[in-house]
Regions:
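Residues on the lipid-exposed face of transmembrane beta-strands in outer-membrane beta-barrel proteins
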Residues: 35-37, 58-64, 78, 116-120, ...
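Transmembrane beta-strands of outer-membrane beta-barrel pores
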Residues: 37-43, 64-66, 92-98, 132-138, ...
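Short glycine/proline- and aromatic-enriched beta-strand/turn motifs that initiate or cap beta-hairpins
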Residues: 23-68, 165-169, 233-295
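Short loop/turn motifs that connect adjacent beta-strands in outer-membrane beta-barrel proteins
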Residues: 22-29, 66-85, 125, 151-157, ...
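Outer-membrane beta-barrel translocator/channel fold
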Residues: 51, 99-105, 158-198, 225, ...
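Residues that define the transmembrane beta-barrel architecture of outer-membrane proteins
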Residues: 29, 52-58, 108-114, 138-142, ...
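Predominantly the C-terminal beta-signal and adjacent terminal strand-loop region
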Residues: 200-256, 379-431
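Transmembrane beta-strands of outer-membrane beta-barrel proteins
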Residues: 29-35, 58, 67-69, 86-90, ...
Length: 431
């Protein structure tokens, strides 16, 4: 997972910055952000007869001519010509491992698979997709999918049917858990039937839902730990997307930006920090971050909010208690600008963060709480800036801002299996 996320997030930043900085105008982009709650049945025998497991799943959505982010999936287009029915992409996708939540942390959460996809569009509604995917141990599976998109007024529906081939190593790892049981099973083919739905409520607000059922192959079903042949899942939630009732703007008010910050770790939680009661890290661990802001839109529900997709690269400096590490972030950030009496702006970002080596501030907290730490965590950013040009009455500086931001990694209070089902994380006060 480490190398794939590293390459993917770094390439995302390069592609976005290259495209946007070359344009004199910034048109409104296809974007979205959502909060989903997933519940799935557990097909395995469990000690406490747990039949379902649930997780909170924040999602981002974005697409331009170079790449896309679609909820739990993202990719880079290798071939995508407007006059062709074919499309080829390098993709990554989160795959849920549905076991009781009490043991998900020991299993180190869900998995991110990487691979390639070829898509063929039969017409404006129906398409076929072929994928070859692998996990971080290069255990392979392939997907053969037929799917469609239909719109009926405020409703959008996406039915799909997928046949999945799993090699013996993949099947043994995720359906007989060979490392724990010693049981090896053969390759198999399972089938999944599902449907996604999106309903436009008003303006930028949408309701989201998804359900599917999977029929396990005979090799998986006859594993000594599998109890049920059929497994179901349901997603429900809401999100903010482009208002389908409005024509997209051809020239946005907000422009791309680059943000550089330096920060200091604190063992304090977010509540104490906002109360101005933060403790200093005794080892003075520090970080330096670089973020690029790609404009998505300049309003939400008719309010003047500047919305950005913001990939970032963070260097955590070595100290007496940690070696250096690199963090990769991708998030969606909203800014609200106001006058008091000079021009200020307040920002909030939500996204995900991957770090190649766990920092001291996170490792010590996880050790105290008895968790296995997770490299992949949820990301939050809160910032307040003052406009330098306004502050010094210099028109040439009106695009420059200076201020404070809180750099936060966490796992959503044990409610997210994809983040290792842990509670806690790290905070850095940055300027």
């Amino acid at each position: 997972m480490k190398h794939v996320l590293t390459v993917s997030l770094a390439c995302s930043g390069l592609l976005l910055s290259g495209a946007a900085l070359a344009e004199s105008k910034n048109a409104e982009q296809e974007w979205g952000i959502a909060a989903m709650y997933r519940t799935a049945s557990i097909p395995f025998y469990t000690a406490n007869d747990d039949s379902t497991v649930s997780t909170f799943v924040p999602m981002m959505f974005f697409e331009n001519e170079h790449l896309y982010i679609d909820g739990i999936e993202g990719g880079v287009f290798l071939y995508d010509e407007s006059d062709s029915d074919w499309r080829a992409s390098a993709i990554m996708r989160l795959r849920f491992v549905d076991i009781p939540k009490s043991i998900q942390n020991a299993f180190e959460g869900d998995r991110v698979d990487f691979g390639g996809q070829i898509r063929y569009n039969f017409d404006e509604n129906w398409r076929a997709e072929f994928e070859v995917m692998a996990d971080d141990e290069f255990q392979f599976h392939s997907n053969y999918r037929i799917a469609a998109n239909y719109e009926f007024g405020d409703w959008e529906l996406e039915p799909s049917f997928t046949i999945r081939y799993k090699d013996a190593d993949f099947n043994s790892s995720y359906y007989s858990f060979k490392d724990a049981t010693g049981e090896k099973i053969g390759a198999g083919i399972d089938a999944n039937l599902g449907i996604k739905a999106r309903y436009h409520v008003i303006s930028n607000l949408y309701l989201l839902g998804e359900t599917s059922v999977t029929r396990l192959d005979s090799e998986a079903y006859h594993s000594q730990i599998v109890e049920d042949r059929y497994q179901g899942e349901v997603f429900v939630g809401f999100g903010f997307f482009n208002d389908k009732g409005k024509e997209r703007k051809s020239d946005l008010r907000n422009r791309p930006y680059l943000r550089v910050a330096h920060g200091w770790a604190t063992p304090s939680n977010m509540g104490d920090i906002f109360k101005l009661n933060a403790e200093k890290d005794e080892y003075n661990n520090q970080m330096t971050s670089f973020f690029y802001g790609h404009p998505l839109t300049d309003e939400l529900f008719g309010l003047p909010l500047d919305i950005y997709l913001t990939p970032g690269l963070v260097h955590h400096w070595s100290s007496d208690v940690q070696s250096s590490s690199t963090e990769y972030v991708v998030a969606i950030k909203a800014y609200y600008t106001f006058n008091w009496p000079t021009k200020w702006r307040f920002g909030v970002a939500e996204g995900m963060s991957y770090i190649d080596n766990i920092t001291y501030i996170e490792a010590t907290e996880m050790e105290e709480k008895g968790y296995t730490p997770s490299n992949l965590l949820n990301y939050l950013d809160f910032s307040v800036d003052v406009n330098v040009g306004d502050l010094f009455n210099q028109k040439d500086w009106e695009n420059m801002w200076v201020g404070y931001s809180l750099h936060h990694r966490s796992a959503i209070f044990e409610n997210a299996s994809q983040f290792g089902r842990i509670k806690g994380g790290s905070n850095y006060n940055t300027i």
